[in-house]
Structure formats: structure tokens, C-alpha cells
Amino acid sequence: MTNHQKRLAVPKSWPVERKEEAYTTKAAAGPHGEEGVPLLIVLRDVLGYVDSKKEARYALEQDSILINGTAVSDERRPVGMFDILAFDEREEYYRIFPDEGGRLSLTPIDEDAAGSKLGKIVGKTQVAGGDTQLSLHDGETLLVEDATAYDTNDSIVVSNDGEEIVAHFTYEEGALVTAVSGAHAGRIGTIDEIQVTPGSSANNVLIDAENDDERFETVEEYVVVIDENFTDGGDDE
């Protein structure tokens, strides 16, 4: 199996220039599905910390580059929306976040905020023993005892060890949200109205945009609940 893919075929969210070279690195299997960006692309093309795959591998051997609190050894490890990228030796911390063009970008955050990660709940399943399993947007799962406390489309902030939910943001009218895909990717605002669509069609969401008087509309799938500290580099709690 090849470790490369054509640049023209990569998802629009990848932060690569499509016309520079014919091929780019292919992500390994892991979280975020097809949207996952190989760590090498972030280190080389976005941050400029390495010039080659060889340099990336050497940097990773030092165990000082972490994703969501865990040291990474594979330069093809996929990273994606809301992942936390930490460089311990540099004391630099970033949250991966879609910009207004829909590409994944790096938002600097402080060390405290780097200790946990936001996830959108995309599914709930009851499992043996009576607990409820929450499925998050990146493929991760989490067991909770109180099934009624969390709903699909809510957001939770989970500690990097996965053992504690440190914040919970409810999906409802009046909630602060960001659009993560589509024509309005990267925009932030407050939900004005959730338009429930009968049948299997997607619900629409009307959002009052932050910092201007505009309102925009997107589908529920593209909306993630955040809080006021989420985009300024502070802690989510």
C-alpha cells in the first residue's frame, strides 16, 4: 500500500497547496477518518519545524511532540479538528481549528487549555451494565453513567487521559457555536433558531454571527457548541 496520495485528491480541509507537487503524504489509519491530516504535513508545511520525513522522525523520537497528551512516534499519525498539539520543549500548544476557508489551522492556546480536548457528541448507545457510550466526532468513545445528562450535538471537554469530563456545553438556541464545514466554516455566532426538518433531511440552524450584524444558515451537522474562551487561547472550563 502506498504512503502517498495525489495532492489534488486530498480533502479541502487539508492545509496543503494542491499545485506545488503531484503527491503528498498519506495519513495512517486512525481518528478523524478521511479528514485526518498526517502530522508530517503540520510539522513541515504549516509550522516549518522540519524539512523532510527524516527530520520529522528524528523529532518524534525525542518524545516531546504530543497529540492530546500522548507522545507520537509516527509522522503519518492523523490529526484533525479540535486535537491538541503540544511541543513540550518549545512550550508551545495549539488547538486544531477550521479557518474561514474550511482548512484546518493552528490556534495557539495556553498550557492549561492543552490538558483537555473538546468533542462533539454524534451518537449515544446503551451498553452492557447499564452505562451509556458517547460517540464523538473524531471516532473516540466515552462511557457515562447518566444517559439523560448528554444529548447528541452537545459538546463535552474531556481530559487528555479520557477519564474526566471537565465541561459540558448543551446544543440549544442561545448557545455559542462555530461552523466547522461548508460555506461558513470558521464563523462563530449564537444559535438563533434550530429548524427541525421532518423526515431524514438535515435540520437547519440559523446563527447570529459574532462581531457583525449578519445572520447565516447552515446544517446541524456542521455546527459545534463551544464557549466564550474557546477561540482566545484560554481554558475551556
From Swiss-Prot:
It comes from the Archaea. One of its GO terms (molecular function) is structural constituent of ribosome. It holds the Pfam family Ribosomal_S4e. It comes from Natronomonas pharaonis (strain ATCC 35678 / DSM 2160 / CIP 103997 / JCM 8858 / NBRC 14720 / NCIMB 2260 / Gabara). Residues 37-99 form the S4 RNA-binding domain. Belongs to the eukaryotic ribosomal protein eS4 family. GO terms for biological process: translation. This is Small ribosomal subunit protein eS4. Keywords: Ribonucleoprotein, Ribosomal protein, RNA-binding, rRNA-binding. GO terms for cellular component: cytosolic small ribosomal subunit. The keyword Transferase does not apply. InterPro entries: Rib_uL2_dom2, Ribosomal_eS4, Ribosomal_eS4_central_region, Ribosomal_eS4_central_sf, Ribosomal_eS4_KOW, Ribosomal_eS4_N, Ribosomal_eS4_N_CS, S4_RNA-bd_sf. The keyword rRNA processing does not apply.
